[in-house]
Amino acid sequence: MPADTRPAAIVLMGPTASGKSQLAIDIAKRWGGEVISVDSVLVYRGLDIGTAKPNAAMRASVPHHLIDICEPWETYSAADFAHDARAAIDMIVRRGALPILTGGTGLYFRALLAGLSDMPPAHPEIRAMITAEAKRDSWATLHTRLAEVDAITAARIHATDPQRIQRALEVYRVSGRSMSDWQKQPLKQRLPLRVLKLVLAPTHRKVLHFRIAQRFKAMLDNGLLAEVNALRTHPSIHAMARPLNLPAMRAVGYRQCWEHLDNMYTAETLYQRGVAATRQLAKRQLTWLRGELDALWFDPEHDQSRIEKVVEAFLNR
């Protein structure tokens, strides 16, 4: 059997608060790598504390890519990510370094590693109509309407996931075809890499829940509310009719802080809601990760030496 001459890449996935960022840096330092963020919120400038964005020292220790590349009032799609990540990978490989892709945004990983079907681009007018509909009738109602025209996609989307409900309805209303129908088309070219997939996740869920609660408290202590207030008073965001519909402002933690600043609930309720929303995000991420059948799972607190051995063996193949 001929040797696989494709460039190697490490894919490090996991739920939020599992310790991926530091492990990615450790791997990069040991094996001459560069980190590519696979996170739909880290792309935004100004969202630092609430995203646990790698700090300046971490980013100076090894090169990082696709962090702070757009403004929080802009949109950034999975297709945008796949394009930019391919460019970053090409650059890293040309330098003779190891691409290390790390994050928790499953759609971004799928877009890059498996490819995307061609679909209609975003349509601002249709999107605004859907948003107005949701404000009037609720996202749960729109989820029901989606099920009437695209039962397959609706079954994959939770009724509390407005961004995906909106996109699925937008695709249908723009094209007259369901998203599931579009997804039956041949995928765009897959990434020509030899990939090792690792999942970093605590073995016991209560450990992850503890880490989530501890981290959200630290975010609040470190100034998350001030960060959100700076975002909401920025002229480009403040001038918007519905700023909370921005993908950046729908991010876990940011929406809850915004609502607290609007006096919708107390500081204690903010903490409780922020932790609950983060736990729900982690649950969705774990559901997706269980479908990654070719990934190897590791516990962040006990498996450091095992991870090193697996990476070493993969790179020496």
Swiss-Prot record:
The record marks T105, R127 as: Interaction with substrate tRNA. The keyword Amino-acid biosynthesis does not apply. Disulfide bonds: none annotated. Transmembrane segments: none annotated. It holds the Pfam family IPPT. The keyword Transferase applies. Its EC number is 2.5.1.75. It catalyses: adenosine(37) in tRNA + dimethylallyl diphosphate = N(6)-dimethylallyladenosine(37) in tRNA + diphosphate. Residues 39-42, 163-167 are annotated as: Interaction with substrate tRNA. Substrate binds at T16, A17, S18, G19, K20, S21. Keywords: ATP-binding, Magnesium, Nucleotide-binding, Transferase, tRNA processing. ATP binds at G14, P15, T16, A17, S18, G19, K20, S21. PANTHER family: TRNA DIMETHYLALLYLTRANSFERASE. Belongs to the IPP transferase family. Monomer. Catalyzes the transfer of a dimethylallyl group onto the adenine at position 37 in tRNAs that read codons beginning with uridine, leading to the formation of N6-(dimethylallyl)adenosine (i(6)A). This is tRNA dimethylallyltransferase. The lineage of its organism: Bacteria, Pseudomonadati, Pseudomonadota, Gammaproteobacteria, Lysobacterales. The gene is miaA.
